[in-house]
């Protein structure tokens, strides 16, 4: 049985071949659920690929760790998380009044145990930043890809 490809916060522009999850009941949305309400209505390790285009900057900062931990829970081992986002503090970030959570190229080191100086602060579920990421896609738009890594003894 194949695993799900999930588009979180898909809105009306769901990626082709993906299951769309959004908090609004609109065309293209398959699962209506708020990304800040945990747990998501999905089984553990049910997704092989999760994409989020311009969604993480809308997650309230106090939900950030739990949000990434929940994506980790539903991600299958070796699955890929692809996120596109405006750089925190940039024009693209500040132009939308609903943007509340800024990310930059080093933010994701807090989720990867290979960067222990940052990872030990919050000890989230361990992700692995894929080689060559994050990358700049436009003037102030970035993309990061991470894979699910096994839980270690220091992860809570």
Question: What is the meaning of each model-derived region?
Answer:
Residues 61-156:
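S-adenosyl-L-methionine-dependent methyltransferase catalytic module, highlighting the catalytic core
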Residues 3-89:
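Conserved SAM-binding loop
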